[in-house]
Curated annotation (Swiss-Prot):
The gene is esr2. A zinc finger (NR C4-type) spans 155-175, 191-215. The keyword Transcription regulation applies. Binds DNA as a homodimer. Can form a heterodimer with ER-alpha. Signal peptide: none annotated. Residues 155-220 bind DNA. One of its GO terms (cellular component) is nucleus. This is Estrogen receptor beta. It is found in: Nucleus. Residues 272-508 form the NR LBD domain. One of its GO terms (molecular function) is steroid binding. It comes from Oreochromis niloticus.
Length: 557
């Protein structure tokens, strides 16, 4: 009051206002009648300059807006102490009949206050809203950087979407497989043009010579394999893990989910028959080419050389195909080896029938090798096997076998090949056998679903299922004939066998001659006589195993 009296301007102190004026003229927003701060201690006298009173100025309500109107995420006005103090009841006009302590309004500030930086009641709200907006922008930027196209790569050869980091560069599955075939086999490709063919997504198969040349130009090397490959699926999984961890850290500590234990240890859900068929279709190996043309006329040695070379290449892809069958790698290592050793020729023969179904009277061993009955007659004892294969292929053509049915039958041949070999009573073998039976049941359901898609009646579906299963017995019979013939060719030293093919042949003969009452010591002795480990792939040891090493690995586990 002393400072107000010393002011050159005339101030008027109001003690009481008419009730009709006080009810409609409010100088600040009303937070509520029960708002705290109505005590006399927080009230100050109100000083209004005389010109305002002389002119009869009309004081209308001053509007205050909530921060939420401006999209601020700060605290409410009632939670802010500075704003709450400035909006106390001391700013209101006194009600009629009550003489309250006068409130000071429009009072001139002292020099000490003028020197300080002016702070408004909204400073804390604006600061809070800015920090909230900054955190939201940072979270959006992190989400974009983690879940955007940062992990998307293109093939350096054909510019298709890359599936991973293969042979030293980012490449797609097609160019990776092509380069792998080229460095493993013959790569004496010849360009029909000027060695300047365009290699892109649509024309990458037009010229093998220019495609291989571009593979070397972009930096693909035989030894350029990373230990931790940049697989696109793994990067997606890591990205989802980061996003889930960010969501967990942003969640309040006091709030927990109802099934926190189930989230930490999720159970692997079983695949539906539809999903199982899709996975098996994706696991199909690529087409294999001999690259070199067969010299005519064909001889017994040249035909056997071509067939054994092709079979050795197919065995490499067969191992990779088997590992992609859902649930196969969950079996014991010994069972995985036994299954492949007992069914490899059956798998090759059903693939041969599938490729030859549209070519009556011929067997299509690969896209660049087809033989007729007359051409196969140059090999001693091969005509009988050729006729059996032609008859089985004719039966497949009569049944109009669909691709989904074919892949299911092929997987069933793999899983049903050594049902009678597991005679051990140890817990690990019994557990692996139970897994194998569950896999067979799932594969049978997938085959039934594939048959149901043909649009037949239920009775016709049952009949078709029986015909398809009876076809497997014919394939096994032809496989046994082919195994005996291949063993005779080996004993006569007509053609040198490759390492992987030789091991598979010896292992199959050993299993077929094994008696049920044979002691386990003798069995382990026979297993140790199998040839040395085989390195079938330049990409790594994923396609390499021996029966002896497999058993040693199983015992160590």
């Amino acid at each position: 009051m002393m400072a107000a009296a010393s002011s050159p301007e005339k101030l008027l102190q109001l003690q009481e206002v008419d009730s009709s004026r006080a009810g409609s003229r409010i100088l600040s927003p009303i937070l509520g009648s029960s708002s705290p701060g109505l005590s006399h201690e927080t009230s100050q006298p109100i000083c209004i300059r005389s010109p305002y009173t002389d002119l009869g100025h009309d004081f209308t309500t001053i509007p205050f807006y909530s921060p939420t109107i401006f999209s601020y995420g700060g605290p409410s006005i009632s939670e802010c102490s500075s704003v709450h103090q400035s909006l106390s009841a001391s700013l209101f006009w006194p009600s009629h009949g009550r003489v309250g302590t006068p409130i000071t309004l429009h009072c001139p500030q002292g020099r000490s206050q003028q020197g300080q930086s002016a702070q408004t009641p909204w400073d804390s709200v604006i600061t809070t809203s800015k920090s909230v907006r900054r955190r939201s922008q940072e979270s959006e930027e992190s989400m974009v950087s983690s879940g955007g196209k940062a992990d998307l790569h293109y093939c350096a050869v054909c510019h298709d979407y890359a599936s991973g980091y293969h042979y030293g560069v980012w490449s797609c599955e097609g160019c990776k497989a092509f380069f792998k075939r080229s460095i493993q086999g013959h790569n004496d490709y010849i360009c029909p043009a000027t060695n300047q063919c365009t290699i892109d997504k649509n024309r990458r198969k037009s010229c093998q010579a220019c495609r291989l040349r571009k593979c070397y130009e972009v930096g693909m090397t035989k030894c350029g394999i990373r230990k931790e490959r940049g697989n696109y699926r793994n990067s997606q999984a890591r990205r989802l893990t980061r996003l889930s961890s960010q969501g967990k850290t942003a969640e309040p500590k006091g709030i927990t989910g109802p099934a926190e234990g189930s989230l930490n240890k999720p159970e692997k859900p079983a695949l539906t028959p539809e999903q199982l068929i899709e996975r098996i279709l994706e696991a199909e190996p690529p087409e294999i080419y001999l690259v070199k043309d067969a010299k005519r006329p064909l001889t017994e040695a040249s035909v056997m050389m071509l067939l054994t070379n092709l079979a050795d290449k197919e065995l490499v892809h067969m191992i990779s195909w088997a590992k992609k069958i859902p649930g196969f790698v969950e079996l014991s290592l010994v069972d995985q080896v036994h299954l492949l050793e007992c069914c490899w020729l059956e798998v090759l023969m059903i693939g041969l029938m599938w490729r030859s179904v549209d070519h009556p009277g011929k067997l299509i061993f690969c896209p660049d090798l087809s033989l007729s009955r007359e051409e196969g007659s140059c090999v001693q004892g091969f005509v009988e096997i050729f006729d059996m294969l032609i008859a089985a292929t004719t039966r497949v053509r009569e049944l109009k076998l669909q691709r989904e049915e074919y892949v299911c039958l092929k997987a069933m041949i793999l899983l049903n090949s050594n049902m009678c070999l597991s005679s051990s009573d140890c817990s690990e073998d019994l557990q692996s056998r139970s897994k194998l039976l569950r896999l067979l049941d799932a594969m049978t359901d997938a085959l039934v679903l594939a048959i149901g898609k043909t649009g037949l009646t239920f009775r016709q579906q049952y009949t078709r299922l029986a015909h398809l299963l009876m076809l497997l017995s014919h394939i096994r019979h032809v496989s046994n004939k082919g195994m005996d013939h291949l063993h005779c060719m080996k004993m006569k030293n007509i053609v040198p066998l490759y390492d992987l093919l030789l091991e598979m042949l010896d292992a199959h003969i050993m299993h077929s001659s094994c008696l049920p009452h044979q002691p386990p010591q003798q069995d382990s002795k026979d297993q140790s006589e199998v040839p040395a480990p085989l390195h079938s792939s330049a990409g790594g040891p994923s396609n390499t195993w021996t029966p002896s090493s497999a058993r040693a690995g199983g015992e160590s586990q």
